[in-house]
């Protein structure tokens, strides 16, 4: 098992020059990070207040009062029992009280994580100073014992860790660790890292299976994967042990959530409390049974993705086959039965959760942005367990589609929910679709998604490469332009990559040898393996492998075929004596694929979706007119001649006015080069009277029978214009659909 393991390259060892991802990172650096800092400080007009930095300042001020007053200091009484605290007067919040959701601290942690990634490659003294000042405030809020969660610091520490199910202290720890590690790696500054270690040490003392410890685990997972990261940075075994404990203790009986609920009901004299006896009651938390007994992805999709990521991490580092098998079972259930064609997961608004197998609604899809990001986390860690192209294919789809759809092209508004079909009229009128927004929002009270997008975009290079634990193989999982640095069998190697994805499948990688640790000449050949993913979207593994050629594979003379090839699990392994300046070129076919869903996916029966390369496409009303449910792909024409689907590069012009007085849906004028598809199609004509009503016909009486005797549908020839899914809703409120009727 261990021979398959690999680890990602350090952030500073991969430089992104890729035109696509460099533009995304530049957008995050110049627009999103400053915008989100304003949001954390409640300085975005029209946006829901965050209260994040308000809470840290309040906790820091309380600590200062405690230091000044000494024994005379009276700690705050417990006044907050809910999930979200709001000020009585929103215009004048009390500077000493906690507001927002119980996990509000994490908004800062995710923001500073993105800042750390950005500063690693783009030094910005002003941004770094802002972050340092914010870190000073956060660290000033920490208690002497290491505890750091403003919800309880400002609401009676006697209640700390008494409601693990609902009040997310361990979730806050996880994000604090992630942010602290990123900022340390990006800047070399360890103030926040030391604070995170102190909090982790406090938790390590309190939790576990030893006498006197709390046999608990996070209600909302992420601490598991974060503690692994802390272990990898510090080398402290106790952090890995704590992560393993959280993973393996979860779901064991008696349930800690039940125990604490009973204790809290007694403490609060809650006469209405009734114990929950549903045997499946903690499926929402992935805690209905121990993970080694789980075989279906259930519950809150983001929590699940984070938990499965930590599971895969621990399986790799503990070399635990049972945990690895559990991770693979859960992966298979997601990919085979619960994955949207856009790389999204979690189809139901009820609990922001996975539904039953094959239940993948389109217009009511939840498909939270954070859930797609959690899937990318999980996929990356499955790749570290074992290099299989399927993991990278899914990771790539999640990154290019749902993750990027979560952010407007100007970086100033965001989707929490990512449907695959939108009728704005229904969104405004149908309470069942209350969660679906036809345009992006400026901010959210529960603002987990915007900073999550920022942190994964700024660290996307960490998803592109891993190095085998034996040090002999460099894996390329994502094709993006840049320079990757690794040590392979003792030789410093640089891979200088140019790539034109996601719009074209071509590019090359130039091998640069920098010598070994002893300073051997850079020109000396070195033996190692370069393994390149064969993208599933090519459609044929052999065709994908044939699209890759390397110098040294078929030379004449004594050096004939000094580099050999082998295909394993969707990767092409090129092994041999590499020379400085050798190149690996690739030119992957990028056919337009017309996909059909499994027949058990009822919502998609008789429909098709279009994918090219890693990009899923959609139709918007702006290009195709209203009533997209009457637009059909001409599948017969496409099957007869696949080339009938035309690929066209074009300049996509984004820009829209807000749809309300808060400016929701507003997008600044932006132009981005991308690809659109022109697909043979046909339309069902509307009844003449309805068609005459024109725009807004849904709001006027339809002067045609509601029902009529069946007659064959007339076909009006049309061409469907499809744009990348991530670009939808950047031109104002309009209909959208991913799946077209066939």
Question: Which residues make up each language-model segment?
Answer:
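Low-complexity, Ser/Thr/Pro/Gly-enriched N-terminal "stalk/linker" regions
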Residues: 1-107, 132-151
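Structural helix-adjacent loops and short alpha-helical linkers that scaffold large soluble proteins
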Residues: 4, 9-11, 15, 119-132, ...
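Solvent-exposed loop and edge beta-strand segments that line ligand/cofactor-binding
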Residues: 5-6, 64-69, 86, 90-108, ...
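C-terminal beta-rich recognition modules with glycine/proline-rich loops and embedded aromatic residues
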Residues: 13, 19, 25, 243, ...
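Hydrophobic core segments within long, regular secondary-structure runs in both alpha-
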Residues: 18, 25, 37, 112, ...
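Well-ordered alpha-helical scaffold segments within catalytic/enzyme domains
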Residues: 21, 112-125, 174-189, 223-235, ...
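A conserved hydrophobic secondary-structure block that centers on an alpha-helix together
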Residues: 155-233
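Beta-strand-rich binding/interaction modules
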Residues: 524-554
């Amino acid at each position: 098992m261990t021979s398959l393991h690999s680890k990602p390259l350090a952030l500073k060892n991969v430089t992104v020059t890729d035109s696509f991802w460099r533009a995304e990172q530049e957008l995050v650096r110049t627009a999103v990070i400053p915008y989100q800092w304003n949001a954390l400080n409640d300085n975005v007009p029209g946006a829901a207040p965050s209260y994040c930095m308000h809470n840290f300042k309040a906790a820091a001020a309380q600590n200062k009062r405690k230091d000044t007053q000494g024994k005379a200091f009276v700690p705050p009484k417990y006044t907050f029992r809910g999930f979200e605290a709001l000020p009585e007067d929103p215009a004048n919040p009390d500077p000493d009280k906690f507001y927002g959701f119980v996990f509000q601290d994490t908004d800062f942690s995710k923001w500073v994580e993105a800042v750390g990634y950005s500063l690693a490659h783009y030094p910005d003294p002003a941004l770094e100073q802002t972050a340092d000042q914010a870190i000073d405030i956060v660290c000033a809020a920490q208690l002497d014992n290491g505890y750091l969660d403003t919800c309880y610091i400002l609401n009676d520490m006697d209640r700390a860790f008494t409601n693990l199910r609902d009040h997310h202290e361990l979730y806050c720890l996880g994000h604090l660790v992630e942010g602290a590690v990123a900022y340390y790696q990006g800047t070399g500054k360890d103030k926040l890292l030391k604070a995170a270690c102190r909090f982790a040490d406090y938790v390590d003392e309190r939790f576990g299976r030893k006498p006197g410890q709390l046999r608990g685990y996070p209600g909302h997972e992420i601490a598991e994967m974060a503690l692994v990261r802390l272990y990898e940075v510090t080398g402290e075994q106790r952090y890995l042990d704590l992560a393993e404990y959280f993973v393996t203790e979860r779901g064991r009986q008696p349930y800690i959530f039940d125990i604490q609920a009973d204790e809290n009901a007694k403490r609060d004299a809650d006469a209405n409390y009734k114990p929950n006896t549903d045997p499946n009651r903690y499926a929402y938390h992935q805690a209905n049974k121990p993970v080694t007994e789980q075989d279906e992805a259930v519950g809150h999709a983001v929590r699940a993705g984070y938990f499965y990521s930590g599971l895969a991490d621990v399986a790799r580092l503990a070399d635990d086959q049972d945990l690895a098998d559990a991770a693979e079972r859960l992966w298979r259930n997601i990919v085979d039965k619960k994955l949207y064609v856009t790389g999204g997961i979690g189809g139901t608004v009820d609990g922001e959760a996975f539904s039953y197998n094959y239940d993948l609604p389109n217009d009511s899809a939840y498909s939270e942005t954070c859930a797609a990001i959690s899937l990318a986390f999980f996929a990356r860690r499955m790749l570290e367990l074992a290099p299989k192209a399927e993991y990278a294919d899914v990771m790539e789809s999640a990154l290019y589609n749902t993750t990027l759809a979560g952010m407007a092209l100007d970086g100033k508004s965001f989707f929490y929910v990512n449907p695959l079909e939108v009728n704005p009229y229904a969104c405004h009128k149908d309470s069942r679709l209350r969660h679906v927004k036809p345009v992006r929002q400026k901010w959210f009270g529960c603002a987990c998604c915007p900073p999550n997008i920022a942190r994964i975009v700024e660290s996307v290079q960490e998803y592109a490469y891993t190095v085998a634990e034996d040090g002999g193989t460099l894996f390329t999982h994502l094709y993006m332009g840049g320079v990757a640095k690794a040590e392979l069998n003792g030789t410093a190697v640089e891979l200088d990559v140019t790539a034109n994805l996601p719009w074209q499948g071509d590019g090359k990688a130039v091998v640069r040898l920098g010598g070994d640790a002893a300073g051997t000449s850079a020109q000396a050949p070195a033996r190692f393996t370069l393994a390149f993913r064969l993208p599933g979207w090519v459609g044929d593994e052999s065709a994908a492998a044939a699209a890759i050629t390397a110098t040294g594979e078929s030379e004449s003379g004594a050096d004939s075929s000094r580099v050999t090839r082998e295909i394993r699990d969707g990767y092409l392994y090129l092994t041999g004596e590499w020379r400085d300046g050798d190149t690996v070129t690739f030119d992957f076919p990028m056919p337009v694929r017309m996909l059909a869903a499994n027949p058990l996916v009822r919502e998609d029966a008789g429909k098709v979706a279009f994918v090219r390369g890693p990009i899923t496409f959609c139709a918007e009303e702006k290009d195709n007119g209203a009533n997209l449910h009457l637009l059909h792909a001409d599948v017969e024409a496409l099957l007869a001649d696949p080339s009938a689907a035309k690929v066209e590069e074009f300049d996509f012009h984004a820009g829209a006015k807000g749809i309300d007085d808060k400016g929701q849906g507003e997008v600044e004028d932006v132009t981005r080069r991308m690809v659109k598809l022109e697909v043979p199609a046909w339309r069902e004509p509307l009844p003449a009277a309805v068609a005459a009503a024109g725009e807004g016909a849904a709001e006027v009486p339809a002067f045609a029978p509601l029902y009529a005797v069946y007659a064959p549908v007339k076909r009006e020839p049309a061409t469907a214009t499809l744009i990348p899914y991530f670009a939808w809703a950047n031109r104002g409120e309009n209909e959208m659909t991913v799946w077209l009727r066939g």
